[in-house]
Amino acid sequence: MSCCGGNCGCGAGCKCVGCGGCKMYPDLSFSGETTTSEALVLGVAPSMNSQYEASGETFVAENDACKCGSDCKCNPCTCK
């Protein structure tokens, strides 16, 4: 059986996490009932280029190439 319809996400180390993917944001889910208004506040963080620019290294997200299969196992696990 798939994990919540295959809606799980790959986390650190190419391990599947968040197998409640279909209910990722429970406070914002639609339940068919009348509810009060909700606000989502987004912010912007300052750039940290100065620390890493001098190193000459490029960083790639750890789970960039991972995809979760229907059984909630990362497929393929090609994290770089």
From Swiss-Prot:
**Source domain of life:** Eukaryota
Q: Which GO terms describe its molecular function?
A: metal ion binding
Q: Write the record's keywords in alphabetical order, separated by commas.
A: Metal-binding, Metal-thiolate cluster
Chain coiled-coil ranges:
none
Q: Does the keyword Metal-binding apply?
A: yes
Spell out the family assignment given in the record's similarity comment: Belongs to the metallothionein superfamily. Type 15 family.
The record's PANTHER family line, in alphabetical order, gives: METALLOTHIONEIN-LIKE PROTEIN, METALLOTHIONEIN-LIKE PROTEIN 2A
Q: What does this protein do?
A: Metallothioneins have a high content of cysteine residues that bind various heavy metals.
Query: What is the protein's name according to its record?
Result: Metallothionein-like protein type 2, MT2-22
Q: What is the organism of origin for this protein?
A: Brassica juncea (Indian mustard)
